[in-house]
Amino acid sequence: MGENVDAARVRDCLAGDPQAFAALVQQYEKPVYNVALRMLRNPEDARDIAQSVFLKAWQNLSSYDPKYKFYSWIYRMAINESLNILRSHGRDAEPVDERLPAEDAGPADVLAAGQGREAVLAAVGRLKPEHRSVIVLHYFVDLPYEDIADVLDVDAKTVKSRLYSARQVLKDQLAARGVT
């Protein structure tokens, strides 16, 4: 969906059209759930995050700035809510049943579909949250650096640096487990 369509839907929501918000939820519910699932590796927590994100989006829609992409705003909420869950539970992530694929497979799912799929997904789950978020947004959501920077509210150079560091950690973790 284009930025202009999303901005128009937000305007319609603010003008009192509940169907416009329903269209935004329909457009973004799977991507938001998938971001939370990749961050938390727990389907129940991911569903809770998705519900929480859309409730907060509805409550704070008037604070959305249309000069930014709507998906950046909603993904930022999903990442922040996921990080809050990780902090509050004092854990990195719980194992997810790998037989349950995400709703929309991304490039990292294709990459990890071979023999080392479980090892790759487990290694992503062990990353520090700031590294996990850039890996999830770049490889699983397929966002470019600039959009990841918008979502995480950091500079694009920071995204590139975190992505480089995350790749190095993943490479080391996988090599230690004999996955190449």
Spans of model-derived segments:
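Short, charged helix-capping/linker segments at alpha-helix termini
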Residues: G2, L14-A23, Y33-S52, A156, ...
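Internal acidic/polar
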Residues: G2-D6, R91-R117
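Helix-turn-helix DNA-binding module
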Residues: N4, A122-S133, L137-T158, D172
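Sigma70-family region 2
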Residues: L14-A15, R41, S52-K69, S88-G90
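Amphipathic, Lys/Arg- and hydrophobic-enriched alpha-helical face
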Residues: V25-P43, N60, V124, V169, ...
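Structural recognition of an alpha-helix C-terminal capping motif at a helix-to-coil junction
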Residues: N34, D48-L55, Y68-N80
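Arg/Lys-rich amphipathic alpha helix in sigma70-family domain 2
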Residues: S62-P66, R76-V96, A113, S165
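Short, Lys/Arg-enriched C-terminal cap helix and immediately downstream tail that follows
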Residues: R87, R132, R167-T180
